[in-house]
Structure formats: C-alpha cells, structure tokens
Amino acid sequence: MHIRDQIVLVTGGARGLGLAITQALIAEGAKVVVNYHSSQHTATQLMAQHPKQVFAVQADVTSKAEVERLFAQAKAHFGTAIHAVVNNALVHFEFNGDARPKLEDLTAEGMTHQFDGAVLAALYTTQAALADMKQAGFGRIVNIGTNLVQNPVVPYHDYTTAKAALLAFTRTAAQDLGQYGINVNMLSGGLLQSTDASKATPDFVFDLIASSTPLRRVTTPDEFAAAILMFLSPYSRAVTGQNLIVDGGLVKG
C-alpha cells in the first residue's frame, strides 16, 4: 500500500522528531493521526493547516485505556482503521551526560518509567491496531530506537536499556505478526541536531559526533524522518524484524 493511501499514527507527533515525521508523512499525502501528550498548540495548528489529512488526539500512550480510545476516535474520524503506527513518543528525557543518573543512583521507579514509555506504549498501540490490521491483511509498525544500544558511548542506563527491550519486542512481534501481512521494524538514530531532548547537549558534543561520523555532520530530525518512509512504503514489503541505524554511519549496524 502506498503511503498516500495510508492512515498513520505517530505517537508524540507534535514535537521534536515526531513533528518531523508527521510533516514528512503529510508531504507524502498520508492521513496522519497526531498523538500528543502536552503539545496541544502545535497539534491543533497542524489539524487546522491540514484538515483533510491530520487528526490530533491527546492521549497518554502508557495507558492502555487511552490508547484504545485514541484508536476508536481516529477510526471514527477517518472512517477507516489505522494502517501504520510509528511508536515515537518519548517520556521525559534529556540527553545530558553530566546530569544522567549514575548506576549507583538508579531506581526501580526510574527504570520502570523508561520501560513503560518505550515497551508498554509500543505494546498497547500494537495491540490496539492488531484486529483491524489482521482483517486488512496489512499493517506497518515502526518503533523508534537508539544507536546507544550498539554503542553506549554515554551510559544512559534507563533509556538505553528500555530501547534494547523495545528492539527485542520489535523482533518477536515481527516473528509473530508476519503471517498476517504485518511488518514490524525499528529505526534507530543517534543524537539529532536538534530536538527538545538534545537541547541540553553542549555544542562541543555535536562537533565531536560530526567529526567522528563518515558523513561529517550530525543527522537532523528531517533526515531521520525521511528514512521512516521506506519502512512504510511498498519498497520494504519484504522487510520485517530489522533495525535500521540512521546516524550518518557513526555506528555500523
């Protein structure tokens, strides 16, 4: 199914990387369900600017009940079920190596918070999408990961561990759901220049990453978002269970 014919849910789709993903999908002609938690102003602006393509829904994706409500509202609005899900939403986190919790300071609550935001949120959206995707014999799920799983140069223990679990879930879901025509993949990036999460990152860190990257620049949110289009397009119809790293070649998959 071409992107222009799809209804795509983007969780956290009104800020940072999520906004870049939403804008890329709008440009491709897709209908986009923009989920947001607190970015109401931007979400409603998007809906006003693209009334035929965008439907904005506030929901906490770590709540199963709210996710189910989100899917029901989107289906009622567009008259058709969601075809694809991009699990992008990030619970509160800043990429600031100096301020990160050290291993001896980690708590069960902090670890669980990141796990819920990464794995449970993806589980809930996948479960909510499943019945309609099975009936259609088509579905696309893209989970957003991190290259820190392969190369933890800064040990963000809670965040990286949660994303590693999400990668495992991506692979097990792909194995389970492929028989129904549902492809599940992950797209992993490094530090992006810039998003809300990377605003605390000092300039010298961006310079260091650029000098260490084969493309000699730090990947932008727009560049990362463009790679998602491949996983949603017919060109990747035989691709599932994969983790594509989009970081300019810093980490070799």
State where each predicted segment sits:
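Conserved glycine-rich cofactor-binding loop
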Residues: 7, 14-16
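A short, exposed helix-loop element centered on a Lys and neighboring polar residues
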Residues: 126-127, 171
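A glycine/serine/threonine-rich, flexible loop-to-helix segment
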Residues: 44, 99, 179, 186-213, ...
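Catalytic loop of short-chain dehydrogenase/reductase
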Residues: 91-95, 102-114, 140-165, 170-179, ...
